Design a protein with these regions (language model features):
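Generic low-complexity, intrinsically disordered sequence content enriched
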Residues: 5-6, 21, 67, 102
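Immediate post-signal-peptide N-terminus of mature secreted/exported proteins
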Residues: 12-52
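Bacterial N-terminal signal peptides
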Residues: 1-10
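Compact alpha-helical subdomains of small soluble proteins
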Residues: 55-130
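Generic detection of intrinsically disordered/low-complexity segments and helix-coil linkers/edges
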Residues: 2, 29, 40, 105-106, ...
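Short intrinsically disordered, low-complexity segments
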Residues: 7-8, 17, 71
Length: 130
């Protein structure tokens, strides 16, 4: 899943109500990373759909800012970004979500159909695509 680089390439993570909460347990951050990865994967696998790059970058930066607002240091954010086990976990979740949307790995038409449906429903994934 090529989304890993986007998922972790510029996004921090954050604690829920305090910096004591594991960063992976903060829904806004975790889900935002997953949605971004799903959108990226669709845009990479479907030639007729592209990622809204500036929107995506701004969204990822807003997640990083949220992490800082919750009290995480840049070092803590970077540690989370570089956590390979967490990256693998989030990729698996993103792949499963795509599968539930009807995506079949290697079948471009299924990525396109899922992407168009997400755009039409104006989901967070769809909001990141055009």
């Amino acid at each position: 899943l090529m989304a890993a680089e986007v998922i972790h390439g510029g996004v921090g993570a954050a604690g829920a109500l305090s910096a004591q909460t594991p960063q992976k347990d903060v829904a806004k951050i975790r889900d935002g990373i997953i949605y971004t990865g799903m959108a990226y994967e669709i845009s990479e696998r479907c030639d007729s759909i592209s990622a809204r790059l500036f929107r995506g970058i701004n969204y990822l930066q807003s997640l990083r800012s949220h992490a800082r607002d919750l009290g995480y240091s840049e070092a803590e954010i970077e540690d989370y970004i570089n956590d390979d086990a967490e990256k693998d976990r989030l990729e698996a979740i993103a792949r499963e979500q795509l599968r539930l949307l009807g995506v079949v790995e290697g079948e471009e038409a299924t990525y396109c159909a899922a992407g168009r449906a997400q755009i039409a429903a104006n989901t967070r994934v769809g909001w990141l695509l055009r």
